[in-house]
A protein has these predicted regions:
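N-terminal amphipathic/basic leader segments beginning at the initiator methionine
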Residues: 1-26
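Alpha/beta enzyme core
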Residues: 2-6, 18, 31-36, 42-338
Length: 338
C-alpha cells in the first residue's frame, strides 16, 4: 500500500506547477507509433465516397489510398488496417469472394507492400463484408437452429481467407469473427505453408456491442444484416472474466497480439488483460466511439482535438500498447505540433 506524505509535507500540486515538471513526471504518453489506421477500400479508380455516419471518413479506391499510405509513412504511423467494401453482386451465403487471390484485398495488399514496404499492413479475417446475410460466418440452415452461426464450417473458410491474405504479403492477419478455435487453425495453416512471419492479432474479446453501427454502414453490411445480431458468437457486454478465458485460449493457440473491441466502454477489460497476460494488447476505438466524439465536436459541445487526444491517452493509461483509431492521421499531426 502506498502511503503518501501528509499535507503540508506532501503537496501533490508541486508536480503540476509548470509544463516541464508535468512533462517530466507524466506516466503515460502518446506517439504516432501507438496508432493503427483503419481504412475502407473500394474497387475502381478515383473513387472517394464519404461515410455519412463517420464524419471525415471516406471509402477510397486504391489510387486514392496510396497518398494516405504515404501520409502514414511520413507521420510514422506503423500500420494501416484494410477493410473492404465489396460489390453486392459478389456477396454470397458462404462469402467465397473472400478467398479470391485476385480479389480486392489481395490486390490492395500487393500494391501497398510494393510501394511502401516499410508500412505494416493488417487485414480483417471475417466473412461479413462478403456475405449476403451480413454475418461473420455461415448461418445454420436447419429451421430448428435458425440464427445460429456454424463454428467449425466457418473456421475452415476463415483459414483459407487468412492464407489468401498471407500469400498476398500481408504482415498481420486479424481474425475478428469470434469463432472458437480459429486462431489455432489459422496458425497451423500458416506454419504448414511456411508463412512463419505472418503475425496474428486476435480480436480476442470482441463484444456484441451497439457501437458498431457506423462501421457496418461503411463496409456495406448493415443492410445485409438487417435486424439480425451477432450475440451467438460475440461476447456479452456484461462479462469480463470471459474475456480472460478468450484471451488465454487465443494466446495458447498462437496469437502474437490480442485486442479488446470496443475500446473506451471496455477499458476495465483492457486493464485486466494487460495485467493478467503481459502480452501486446490493443484496443479498437470503434466507429460509434469516433462518431460520438465527432458529432459533439461538430456541434461545438466538445473541443475536437482535446477529446481526441484525451480519449487515445486513456487507452494507453488502461494498459493498451496501441489503438486502432480513425483519428490516427489527425492525432499524429496534432502530436507533432504539440
Amino acid at each position: 500500500m502506498i502511503t503518501p506524505a501528509p499535507f503540508p509535507i506532501g503537496r501533490p500540486r508541486r508536480l503540476r506547477r509548470d509544463s516541464f515538471t508535468r512533462n517530466l513526471v507524466r506516466e503515460n504518453t502518446l506517439t504516432a507509433h501507438d496508432f493503427i489506421y483503419p481504412v475502407f477500400v473500394v474497387e475502381g479508380q478515383g473513387q472517394r465516397v464519404a461515410v455519412p455516419s463517420m464524419p471525415g471518413v471516406e471509402r477510397l479506391s486504391l489510387d486514392l489510398l496510396l497518398p494516405v499510405a504515404q501520409a502514414c509513412v511520413e507521420l510514422e504511423i506503423p500500420v494501416m488496417a484494410l477493410f473492404p467494401v465489396i460489390d453486392p453482386s459478389l456477396k454470397t451465403y458462404d462469402g467465397v469472394e473472400a478467398l479470391n487471390p485476385d480479389g480486392l484485398i489481395p490486390r490492395v495488399v500487393r500494391a501497398l507492400k510494393k510501394e511502401f514496404p516499410q508500412l505494416g499492413i493488417m487485414t480483417d479475417v471475417a466473412l461479413d463484408p462478403f456475405t449476403s446475410h451480413g454475418q461473420d460466418g455461415l448461418p445454420d440452415t436447419r429451421p430448428e437452429n435458425e440464427g445460429y452461426i456454424l463454428n467449425d464450417e466457418t473456421t475452415a473458410i476463415l483459414v483459407q481467407q487468412a492464407l489468401t491474405q498471407a500469400r498476398a504479403g500481408v504482415d498481420i492477419v486479424a481474425p475478428s469473427d469470434m469463432m472458437d478455435g480459429r486462431i489455432g487453425a489459422i496458425r497451423q495453416a500458416l506454419e504448414a505453408e511456411k508463412l512463419v512471419h505472418t503475425r496474428i492479432m486476435a480480436y480476442s474479446a470482441k463484444y456484441a456491442s451497439a457501437f458498431y453501427g457506423p462501421f457496418r454502414d461503411a463496409v456495406g453490411s448493415a443492410s445485409n444484416l438487417g435486424k439480425g445480431n451477432k450475440k451467438v458468437y460475440q461476447m456479452d457486454p456484461g462479462n469480463s472474466d470471459e474475456a480472460l478465458r478468450e484471451v488465454a485460449m487465443d494466446i495458447a493457440e498462437g496469437a502474437d497480439m490480442v485486442m479488446v473491441k470496443p475500446g473506451m466502454p471496455y477499458l476495465d477489460v483492457v486493464r485486466r488483460v494487460k495485467d493478467q497476460f503481459k502480452v501486446p494488447t490493443f484496443a479498437y476505438q470503434v466507429s460509434g466511439e469516433y462518431a460520438m466524439l465527432m458529432a459533439a465536436a461538430q456541434n461545438g459541445w466538445l473541443d475536437r482535438e482535446g477529446v481526441m487526444l484525451e480519449s487515445l491517452l486513456a487507452f494507453k493509461r488502461a494498459g493498451a500498447d496501441g489503438v486502432l483509431t480513425y483519428f490516427a492521421l489527425d492525432a499524429a499531426r496534432a502530436l507533432r505540433k504539440a
